[in-house]
């Protein structure tokens, strides 16, 4: 509804409530790898956080799903998929349906930015990476950024 009309007060109310509830969850549980990898991108190029997350999340989910197959299978099924093996593709389809099918390259990130973002992520977002169900090496973080471009 909101994507069709920014003047829709009811839709803004629903989005605001969802954002508030999401913020409360983040306050208790913290955030995960997607947020940790996105912050350097949005800090470097002034990217809207949600668009940066859209560019990175499917790639990160591909790497996280084997660590928590039941949870990622559940997410996949909610989005019309079959199990954890197609969770990232289910997310990609959802993002396309809501016009958020973006790459970091579309948002101004270039390959020359990868080293700086990787170093920044490993230094500033280590807590977010540690909140993930698997360990992300510096090399893997750089690879995720490159794939997202």
Describe the function of each predicted region.
Residues 82-149:
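C-terminal charged capping/lid subdomain of soluble metabolic enzymes
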Residues 1-93:
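Active-site segments that bind and position negatively charged phosphate/pyrophosphate groups
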